[in-house]
From Swiss-Prot:
Keywords: Cell inner membrane, Cell membrane, Membrane, Transmembrane, Transmembrane helix. It is found in: Cell inner membrane. Probably interacts with cognate toxin CdiA. Immunity protein component of a toxin-immunity protein module, which functions as a cellular contact-dependent growth inhibition (CDI) system. CDI modules allow bacteria to communicate with and inhibit the growth of closely related neighboring bacteria in a contact-dependent fashion. Protects cells against CdiA from the same strain, its cognate toxin protein. Growth inhibition is reversible upon induction of this protein, occurring about 2.5 hours after induction, and requires an energy source. This is Immunity protein CdiI. The chain crosses the membrane at residues 12-32, 51-71.
């Protein structure tokens, strides 16, 4: 029982964080691509905060669903 609970927590905590971090990596990558294309560095803090909040709203539920699905598959695979 303890192993199943640990596996559940591992999948539920790891995948939401992974999806959120990958989504947040898009901000600096987008700024770098914008700088290379236009030659100017345009950083608007209000827009970046909106992007971070949107990424958190989307990344956490997607990661939670992925984590639950992988946890269920790992239980089915053990049997």
């Amino acid at each position: 029982m303890k192993k199943k609970l640990f596996a559940l927590l591992k999948y539920i905590i790891f995948f939401p964080m992974l999806c959120t971090v990958l989504g947040l990596l898009g901000i600096p990558i987008g700024l770098i691509v914008n700088f290379l294309r236009t030659g100017s560095f345009d950083f608007n803090l209000k827009d970046e905060i909106d992007v971070v909040l949107f990424t958190l709203k989307i990344g956490i539920p997607i990661g939670f669903i992925l984590g639950l699905g992988l946890w269920g598959l790992s239980i089915l695979d053990r049997k």
